[in-house]
């Protein structure tokens, strides 16, 4: 079907016929207000771009997304002033498409595919070629920021279902530890801490047990679990460095033990969790340090996204500038900007610290052989149409 006019797929997503220059550096420029008013829209561009548009304090965000191309790149120009943009467009050209599944008049699911020069592509652990299809295990499944103890059970089940279907070789975790029990952002909020105490959420030992149990469950789904050093993981190191445990009698003994680990040059979170894990789970887990590179199919997967170059604040732009092809986390908002991709979150979509309109979404990323990627989104626990 050739789309000649804007076409609604349901009440929340439509195909847009807006026409862009193929050399447009960022195909979302100036279009946010269209997504804000009219809903998620898919439109043509030889680049694959995804950007969220917050619309409400309580509703899910809308998205602007471009398709990629089904034609080979050809941006040749004899005009001197066009050669720069032609060169950039050649670099950013993607053979690909967006798959949109419609459940009903409100719910839809989308994910990206990229094709190689022979027309082969991967979707949900299956390789499709011009002559047939076959199972193909993803190289990695990067989960939306995990936040043990604040993980939404519906998102958790969705990712477990995806992992059981596709059997990824490795699962990569961002913000595996939440740090609610020792959160420095809340140390002066006495009434909030009183509420946490009533709910049993100020015990560091219990929070570590929750993470250990989660890691044992996740490790059963894959060959290797990779834990990316993230800002919430570092909450524990900060808690120990500032000796705030002196004011927390319920955490004091455990914190003293972990403080010695820091003095000995060890990662306190790794030490605490390793002691709690069953041996068969522990041997599958790889802990990255803050400066470790970790590449899957030449895609940087070892940076959480909270740090930019030279210790500056991180962003997807800084991930692209530093690493080129990457999959990061931190923002809780799925996004694609050329080779830099960002997953969403696995936590509840409303926490104590994200007030107002939100672009958060349950979203994770599959990395396939050759480096093709697709974001998988879960809406109320559902991630595709049965």
Predicted regions and their residues:
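A structural signal for short, well-ordered beta-strand segments and their strand-loop junctions
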Residues: 42-43, 64-66, 109-112, 171-174, ...
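Short active-site segment of divalent metal-dependent hydrolases/proteases
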Residues: 148, 178, 233, 307, ...
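Active-site-proximal loop/helix segment associated with metal-binding centers of metalloenzymes
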Residues: 90, 243-298
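A short C-terminal boundary segment appended to hydrolase-like catalytic domains
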Residues: 103-136, 371-386
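A short, well-structured beta->alpha microelement
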Residues: 1-33, 125-130, 283-294
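Core catalytic region of metal-dependent phosphoesterases/phosphodiesterases
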Residues: 1-7, 151-269
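Mobile, glycine- and charge-enriched loop segments
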Residues: 11-14, 125-153
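Conserved beta-sheet core of the metallophosphoesterase superfamily
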Residues: 12-14, 19-106, 299-382
């Amino acid at each position: 079907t050739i789309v000649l006019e804007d076409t609604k797929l349901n009440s929340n997503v439509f195909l847009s016929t807006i026409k862009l220059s193929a050399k447009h550096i960022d195909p979302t420029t100036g279009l946010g207000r269209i997504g804000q008013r009219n809903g998620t829209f898919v439109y043509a561009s030889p680049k694959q771009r995804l950007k969220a548009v917050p619309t409400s304090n309580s509703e899910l965000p809308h998205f602007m997304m471009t398709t990629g191309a089904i034609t080979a790149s050809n941006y040749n120009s004899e005009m001197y002033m066009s050669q720069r943009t032609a060169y950039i467009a050649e670099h950013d050209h993607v053979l690909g498409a967006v798959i949109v599944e419609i459940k009903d008049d409100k719910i839809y699911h989308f994910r990206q595919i990229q094709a190689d020069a022979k027309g082969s592509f991967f979707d949900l652990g299956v390789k499709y070629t011009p002559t047939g299809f076959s199972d193909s295990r993803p190289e990695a499944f990067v989960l939306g920021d995990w936040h043990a103890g604040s993980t939404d059970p519906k998102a958790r089940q969705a990712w477990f279902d995806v992992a059981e279907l596709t059997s990824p070789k490795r699962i990569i975790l961002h913000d595996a530890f939440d740090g609610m029990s020792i959160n420095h952002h809340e140390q002066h909020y006495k009434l909030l801490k009183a509420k946490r105490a009533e709910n049993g959420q100020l015990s560091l030992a219990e929070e570590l047990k929750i993470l250990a149990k989660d890691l044992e469950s996740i490790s059963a789904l894959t060959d290797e679990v990779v834990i990316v050093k993230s800002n919430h993981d570092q909450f524990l190191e900060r808690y120990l460095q500032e000796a705030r445990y002196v004011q927390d009698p319920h955490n004091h003994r455990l914190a003293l033990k972990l403080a010695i680990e820091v003095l000995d040059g060890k990662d306190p979170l790794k030490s605490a969790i390793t002691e709690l894990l069953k041996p068969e789970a522990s041997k599958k887990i790889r802990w990255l340090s803050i400066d470790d590179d970790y590449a899957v199919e030449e895609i940087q997967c070892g940076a959480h996204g909270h740090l930019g170059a030279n210790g500056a604040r991180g962003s997807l732009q800084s991930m692209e500038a530093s690493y080129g092809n990457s999959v990061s986390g931190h923002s809780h908002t799925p996004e694609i900007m050329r080779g830099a991709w960002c997953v969403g979150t696995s936590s509840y979509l409303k926490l104590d610290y994200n007030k107002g309109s939100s672009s958060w979404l349950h979203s994770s990323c599959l990395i396939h052989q050759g480096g093709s990627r697709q974001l998988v989104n879960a809406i109320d626990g559902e991630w595709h149409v049965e």
